[in-house]
Amino acid sequence: MSTPSTRDQSHLKWIADFIWNIADDRLRDVYVRGKYRDVILPFIVLRRMDAVLEGTKQKVLERKQFLDKNNVAEQDGALRMAAGQAFYNVSEFTLAKLKASSQGQRLREDFIAYLDGFSPNVQEILTKFKFRDQIQTLVDAHVLGYLIEDFLDPEVNLSPLPVKDADGRIKLPALDNHGMGTVFEELIRRFNEENNEEAGEHFTPRDVVKLMAKLMFMPVAEQIQSGTYLLYDGACGTGGMLTVAEETLQELAEEHGKEVSIHLFGQEINPETYAICKADLLLKGEGDEAEHIVGGADKSTLSADQFRSREFDFMISNPPYGKSWKTDLDRMGGKKGFADPRFIVSHGDDPEFKLITRSSDGQLMFLVNKLQKMKQRSPLGSRIAIVHNGSALFTGDAGQGESNIRRWVLENDWLEAIIALPLNIFYNTGIATYIWVLANRKADHRKSKVQLIDASSWFQPLRRNLGKKNCELSEADIQRIVDLYLGQPQDTPECKWFDTSDFGYWKITVERPLRLKSQLKRSAIETLRFASGDEALRAEIWGKYGDKLYSEFPKLKPEIEAWLKGDTGEDDDEPEGDEDESTPAKKAVPEKRRKKLLDSATWQRDKTLIELALLAQQELGDGVFDDHNDFRARFDAAMAKHGRKLAAAEKKAIYKAVSWRDEAAPPVIAKRTKLKKDEHFEPGLDGAYLQEAGKDRFMVEYEPDTDLRDTEQVPLKEPGGIDAFFRREVLPHAPDAWIATDATKVGYEISFARYFYKPAPLRSLDQIRADILKLEQQTEGLLQKIVGGVSA
């Protein structure tokens, strides 16, 4: 198995051009460009199948006649045997015979009979394509016959079998599964280039797949024994990755004198790509393997896993990245009802550790799905090669799904290596991509280690772009990467080794105390009139109705409600100058807010707050309290004196209205606990302080100021841990700060680019001096012109 040559790539490009021209010539006035695929893709599959079945057509018809004559009910196995394939067609037609058929409705009937003659496994493929829905349109446009004729052109071979001349020499090469996938991807790109569909779905080039397969198999090549191996791809597309992986494993086994039986398993949500994958497995004679490929719009790997109880030896995939999985999330119960045990695990001291990413990008969910299918009891365990984009390395804060997944992977020591690929290596995207290699049976020298390889500059350019793909990995490039991967664990400019804990950090929350001054001045108290929210609207309503809101609210409510709905009963065509200036402008307030504004209890509650604040003002005066703690104590005493007991929310509203932040004020105490006489207390960095009052000692905790709240990332390998970092980096700048220990979380991120950053070399002094002299010469010339001009 070799990486496709430039000549092979050109040949595939020529085939894609040929098929595109058929589509553009025949379907331009029948379908919009984005719908060409509904006809062209199933036609490609039909032509491939038709070519394979052509040689045994007569034998199949004879066998069918014999079985019918003898009333044999179960005919599938016998007909497959007659066809020499995992599928067959029992109609009297071939595409060549249909080409000679009449046009119009007769051709339609014959073509439908031809489709109906295929075996049940092919019928499912045609159903996924929804191809029968297109036939009448093609007949009405008089293009069905022309399409059949075009796809039978002797200058192109769409078959997985080579076309040979009379002497047995290959005239036209075969179009294998991966070649078909390349053509398919190019056609999809062209079909959708105007509306930019499927931006997150990228067919994986054969050179990348070959590298992935080698990275997956080569470390265990010597351990492969004769026996059965299961390969799995949870986003299998057209099946190219599974095919290359199967070929690689088979070759390795043969090289080591082993006999292996390989079974392929795949799942694909896109009906078209699933149909092509299944069709190509049938074309390869792998009918049993085709039965292990499941797909369709209702077969999402995330929400409808079809292999939940299976474990696999090797897993390979290029899942969609940057693509929403919200539909899957909803099917799985949404954020509140999510309970899939694949993504909620016991890890560390958390029995419900969540491996659930944000709904905008589910690529790491595919990785979790694979990790849950690793073999636990076999000596070889399981190995995984998967492609991700850069966001999988660092997206997600500590405690969020993406970071949790990285933490779960690294703390279980499953990640072996990450390899950065060249830009523009894929057909439909130029973004940075990375191969992750994982295993649950690491070699000793890899345990608790992760290898990063920067192969982004190792490639050879293509003569002609294939979509956005402008380069490829040559055989030498692939071997260079594999050699580096298999080599000794030592750092080079392109290879770095890390401990798994190097990527971990504590995210700590740094708090500082709230410092307030307070004053019961009339203007501050008046703001409590609108303390229940929507201050601007409440102010407008108050401005119109005043104290009537407290005594006549039921009477005023219909009028206020109409105004809030934007319906004042006025004529919209009334001149602006005739409007009553006392009438507030029309509003259209959402129902939830409107409901609260129309609740008389909120207005009465705010009125009560004003009354309580004025009562406190009578006792405390309107002077400034420099210490909010003193203010609260005096306020409570005033309320107690008048027999008024306030709820915590009421106090909070009043304090908020009459207080403001001031750095010079003492910290606001949240909790004050008296210590026993012999009780030992050592203040730390967690926000608990010692306060002494005479002979009494108190443990004091302060209210945090949310405006001053900050976070810091502390490496897990920080010497001295969090405390040492905090004393060195935080306390010198904020002596009153503390750590909210309950909020500390562990996160993991892999800053790949930072590890391989190469700063631009500084220019030498001679270069700088030469530039300065050159600028001086230019400046002198310009100055001479200016001075000379003035003199003139």
Q: Where on the chain are the PLM-derived regions?
A:
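Non-catalytic, mostly N-terminal accessory regions of nucleic-acid modification and defense proteins
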Residues: 1-220, 289-301, 306, 420-423, ...
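Hydrophobic alpha-helical scaffolding
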Residues: 5, 137, 173, 202, ...
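Conserved Class I SAM-dependent methyltransferase catalytic core
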Residues: 35-48, 350-438, 772
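Conserved S-adenosyl-L-methionine
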Residues: 202-317, 322-337, 350, 389-391, ...
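Feature representing long, continuous alpha-helical segments
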Residues: 243, 275, 317-319, 364-368, ...
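Surface-exposed acidic, glycine/proline-enriched linker/cap segments
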Residues: 280, 336-356, 366
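Extended hydrophobic-aromatic, low-complexity segments
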Residues: 325-328, 378-383, 394-397, 418-419, ...
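Flexible, glycine-/basic-rich loop-and-beta segments that form/coincide
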Residues: 427-530
